[in-house]
Amino acid sequence: MTLEDKIENLLRPTIETMGFQFWGCEYLPAGKHSTLRIYIDKDEVGVTVDDCGKVSRQVSAIMDVEDPISNAYMLEVSSPGMDRPLFHPEQYKAYEGQEVQVRTSSPVMGRKRFKGVMSQVSESDIAVEVDGELYEIPFSLIDKANVVPQF
């Protein structure tokens, strides 16, 4: 289980009790400048700065007691935004047919970075069309994926 999984299991119940959706989290280690970023959402209405503040206070209290990260870090609570990161297969499914940007931990067909339409989502991977070529990318290799906002 990754650190992010442990943090999600620890925080999800509280965040959902507060009326928000736990969208995901990222831990960005950088010595004493490390960051724990928690993304929350609320169906149809989104989240406000005040919402992020309320959740941040609750999360901070839980993290202080449970202490899953031994190093110093900065806590950020945020909306996923228009370029929302994707963490779970059901999130990918919700954005099937839209443009995404994906970075993998190891090459898939010679590439580690992809930007194109996510044409298919299965239980184990996604298919992204880049410049007319289809790439099947296993979830296990995805380091980061974001929806590309359309204007």
UniProtKB/Swiss-Prot annotation:
One of its GO terms (biological process) is translation. One of its GO terms (cellular component) is cytosol. Disulfide bonds: none annotated. Required for maturation of 30S ribosomal subunits. This is Ribosome maturation factor RimP. The gene is rimP. The lineage of its organism: Bacteria, Pseudomonadati, Pseudomonadota, Gammaproteobacteria, Thiotrichales. It comes from the Bacteria. It is found in: Cytoplasm. Keywords: Cytoplasm, Ribosome biogenesis. Pfam families: DUF150_C, RimP_N. Belongs to the RimP family. InterPro entries: Ribosome_maturation_RimP, RimP_C, RimP_C_sf, RimP_N, RimP_N_sf. It comes from Hydrogenovibrio crunogenus (strain DSM 25203 / XCL-2) (Thiomicrospira crunogena).
